[in-house]
Amino acid sequence: MYGATIGKLGIVGIKLTTNQACCACTPIFIYNKFLFYFLMASKQNFIEQGEGGAQPNISRIKLVNYLFPLPPLKEQQRIVNKLEELIPHIEHYSKVQAELDLLNRNIKEQLKKSILQYAIEGKLVPQDETEGRAEVLLEQIQKEKLKLYEEGKLKKKDLEHSTIFKGEDNKYYEKIGKNVTCIDEEIPFEIPKDWRWCRLGVLTIFLSRGKSPKYSEIKKYPVFAQKCNLKSGKLSLDAAKFLDERTLSKWRDEYKLRNNDILINSTGTGTVGRVGIFSEQILGNYPFIVPDSHISVVRTFSNIDSYYIYYLMCSSIIQQYVEDNLAGSTNQKELYIGVLEKLLLPLPPL
């Protein structure tokens, strides 16, 4: 009769009494099930007639005066019999419709995941052997690293190169310096012969978490945070905070985000692993933007298509790798840079 349960009803099978919150209807010359189904069909009307504030109620007088269509008793019974014949089918089709609605809501995301999986396995487009080999890209990257080392822009340890190859026993091995390790168990699927498996760290000229900023109320130098990486894959500065101008010297140029930088949320339950790709267009009139310590920046060498890496990072197999390798407690998951460096990727020719 009142509250959130206005209109709720049932048929009693035992002797009992009710309190003031319930209205008992004892039918005379009315089939009780017919009355039950009529009241059930009228539930929304009862709710709309409820009066009051926090605890709306419907009075007994309104129920007594509620118009009731009265067919003959045998007709009441026939109506009930037909309803009880149809209700199981209605419930079944309601369940099917709910499942169909859920499928329609999810099909776009599932289709996207399937297409991404076909793409990273080299099955989405025909393979053309005249387009070169991924091995050439890796050789170019190693030459570029050597050049940067000679210019003093890389350390000697950065020259250590991971090479993944298939041995004569048809198993995959990784060579770093003089050490060779079988990694066959890490390989999730076969790739076209002109492709190569490699670690993400090999393909990046800059792979780092951002820094912990000191903020300012002056809206001049925005800081890219987790909230800027939207679930849709788009980026937004609507929730960005701003850097204290007095701390600018803390941020080297390499921390200033550039076109096609891949940005990965690296902490936080529910958002860790979320991926975006940066475009300077979102800066508007801001001179630059830097990432905070909850964001990892993946900046590839120029001969690697950043969008290809971005879509790889969005794929279900990479997202599962991220999920499986998170550290920290349930409430504060964390994705370490070392996990990203070791991320195994299939690399096609450019």
Describe every region a protein language model picked out.
Residues V12-Q20, A24, E48, I176-E186, ...:
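Sequence-specific dsDNA recognition surfaces
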Residues M1-T18, N32-Y37, Q44-G53, L230-L243, ...:
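Short, ligand-facing micro-motifs at secondary-structure edges
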